[in-house]
């Protein structure tokens, strides 16, 4: 089941945002320069009231026209300089922060490739997509604006109040009165807004999941007429997201009103008190004008506190969500050993083992046991006491009923999952000790459900081998009987579209098979590779596949008797255990469950008839249609 929301330890906003430092560090000089430029620009706005004071107490009082024009010119220069500096600040941060976002997204993508299959089994794709898109956009916006202006506005407010207290300390104290209630309100706002922000960003992930599933499954949606049910699911999630966004809007409106009204009341009180002082002659008109102008210059820095805190909280939440994925341990190269991040370097420095050209091709399962990572320790394992030897150059078929563990067993060979106990060896080498990159260059896999990417036919097939020669592509297509490729508009250069849905199921499966054999692997694992083929195409593929299987050691999951005939021997898997091993003909004669499976009775007969798995009692009542044809 996919995970949508992950419980994490509460962290302060500052502590969460500090985790961005490794990504920000390369551009720290540009960000620091931008902050300095913004501080200088903001401080220029505080110089304007001082110029006004000089003009009112000097040229205006003395009716000095020249002085007035000079003051106006200075004000114009200050305004233009402030605008230029703020524009320069934006230029300084635009490119570096786009790079930070790109690096974080690339790091997330690379990390996802290294995470174990158990992680991908649990997590909804929409949650991962939202972390790589919406969340990183929020982080970039924070670095571009709130990060700088929390510093700039804080500095501006500090310098501004120093000037106010220097101009007239009694009026300055009046303006300082709202600080305590504002601090309390901001703390309350931050605690409430953080909850709403996290909920909204999780809901965006849920909504993304529904949209993605509906688009990828559009054939099912339309085929079963589920448009309305999918629309209801979408609208329900959209309604919840809308409600959460309204909660955020109400909180933001409340804090905005508070940080606007309380300072305005203080400014009004200072204006009344200042007017009285001017009337009493205790204060000059120019000083009052300068004081009020300075107070008004601080209006925007104070009023912006609300939405800057909101954006910071959203960025902190986005950062936490990002690191929820990045903190997951990647697959280790060996149990308890280095992570897969170190696989490449380890493989490069270690002495090569299992050279592809020199391998004999023996595959062994020794006491293998497996249970999924999220299963209870005392739960029944999916696979138990698996002992199986596949000789070099041999093809071993895996046969078993639904849920017997066939697909799980094949997934252990390329280490898509790690064995819980026991070991799997290739030519005596424990695969747990092989770097994954090395292991997967030796083992090629074709899954029952073929997955194609939004790329060309050739690119999809050549994913099976980095070193494939041009002739290997044609050979692989011939083996998979994928001659339809040559009839496509651009042949092998034809784009197959997302998930390869422009092709039929059989065509996708043939391309997946071609991908598995293109690299001439030493070990081949096929999970029912012919299930989507018609009888005629299946016969052609089997004929070509026989030649490939002569050159490799293969483990083939088989459901059809015709696929079983490709194998030298058959292993019967029942309830997660190896019930019997032998040739097809031997098992037909000696094992009732195998004979029942091969007869096709699985769909019409009570499976309890075959409960005696591994029994050597003959089953004369069940005769395979192939028995008489086997030599």
Model-inferred region functions:
Residues 13, 31-85, 165-170, 268, ...:
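Transmembrane helix-loop-helix hairpins at lipid-water interfaces of multipass membrane proteins
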Residues 341-631:
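ABC-type nucleotide-binding domain
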Residues 3-13, 36-37, 41-53, 57, ...:
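Juxtamembrane helix-loop junctions of ABC transporter transmembrane domains
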Residues 18, 29-50, 54, 71, ...:
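Alpha-helical segments in transporter systems
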Residues 63-66, 163-177, 251-320, 325-326:
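Helix-loop-helix
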